[in-house]
Amino acid sequence: MKLSHLDEKNHPKMVDVSDKNITLRIATASGIIYMSQEAFDVIKNNTAKKGPVLQTAIVAAIMGVKKTSEIIPMCHPLMLSKVETNIVEFVKECAFKLIVTVKCEGKTGVEMEALSGVSIGLLTIYDMIKAIDKSMRITDIVLESKEGGKSGKFVRS
């Protein structure tokens, strides 16, 4: 399989999307951070010394989405239409799941933006709580779904 971001000499290049049609692009990604009961309670009770952890993680996730083309070398800068975040608590597991959905009308997909948003949001939670629990585990960062473009629709089963 020939990779589109390599030229005929196997040198990296940014894919030329100028001939692609502008279509609605939507992608959703998610990831989970597991932690100790103490760390979970500090977040839930909003008593972290660094401030409101989940609210800060949401803002960080949005910033991560917007900065994707600056930190992932072959990503195109995109005019985003919407970034939506959701955090689900798993009380029994002392975990939070961050879900990020990104939307735009463009010539290339927003999968990397959604994945970057999840990654940055979860890393922000880690950063804000690491004084309490350095053993936190970030896991299962995945693309949940995407639609638009030539490859069509994908939904994780």
UniProtKB/Swiss-Prot annotation:
Task: Write out the GO biological process terms.
Answer: Mo-molybdopterin cofactor biosynthetic process
Binding residue positions for substrate: 74-76, 112-113
Put simply, this protein is called Cyclic pyranopterin monophosphate synthase
Q: Does the keyword Metal-binding apply?
A: no
Note the superkingdom of the native organism: Bacteria
The similarity annotation says:
Belongs to the MoaC family.
Q: Does the record carry Iron-sulfur as a key word?
A: no
Q: Which cysteines are joined by disulfide bonds?
A: none
SUPFAM superfamilies of this UniProt entry? Molybdenum cofactor biosynthesis protein C, MoaC
Taxon lineage? Bacteria, Pseudomonadati, Campylobacterota, Epsilonproteobacteria, Campylobacterales
Q: Which GO terms describe its molecular function?
A: cyclic pyranopterin monophosphate synthase activity; GTP 3',8'-cyclase activity
What InterPro entries does this protein map onto?
Answer: MoaC, MoaC_bact/euk, MoaC_sf, MoCo_biosynth_MoaA/MoaC, Mopterin_CF_biosynth-C_dom
* Quaternary state and interactors: Homohexamer; trimer of dimers.
Matching entries from Gene3D superfamilies are given as: Molybdopterin cofactor biosynthesis C (MoaC) domain
